[in-house]
Amino acid sequence: MRTLCSLLLICCLLFSYDTPVVGELKHLGLKTEFEQCQRIRGYCLNTYCRFPTSHVGSCYPEKRYCCKNIR
């Protein structure tokens, strides 16, 4: 029981803070979403996509939009 509690405490402490390991994993996810937007020939905006474009996905979890021309 003591071992289980110790492991649970270690896991909670590791994942409760933005440690360098968790930060690196976050950046890997951001890079792949950005690359996916670039692959479909889109571009990233901080605001909503305007009229000649359409919203086709996201670039980052921080509410950035992947927009693509309608043509």
Curated annotation (Swiss-Prot):
Pfam families: Defensin_beta
Main location: secreted
SUPFAM superfamilies, per the entry: Defensin-like
GO molecular function: CCR6 chemokine receptor binding
Presence of keyword ATP-binding: no
InterPro entries per record: Defensin_beta-like (IPR001855)
Single GO cellular component term: extracellular space
Subcellular location: Secreted
Secretion signal, residue range per the UniProt entry: 1-23
Protein keywords: Antibiotic, Antimicrobial, Defensin, Disulfide bond, Secreted, Signal
Keyword Nucleus: no
Cysteines joined through disulfide linkages: C37-C66, C44-C59, C49-C67
GO biological process: defense response to Gram-negative bacterium; defense response to Gram-positive bacterium; innate immune response in mucosa
Family affiliation: Belongs to the beta-defensin family.
Record PANTHER family: BETA-DEFENSIN 10-RELATED, BETA-DEFENSIN-RELATED
Described function: Has antibacterial activity.
Protein name in UniProt: Beta-defensin 9
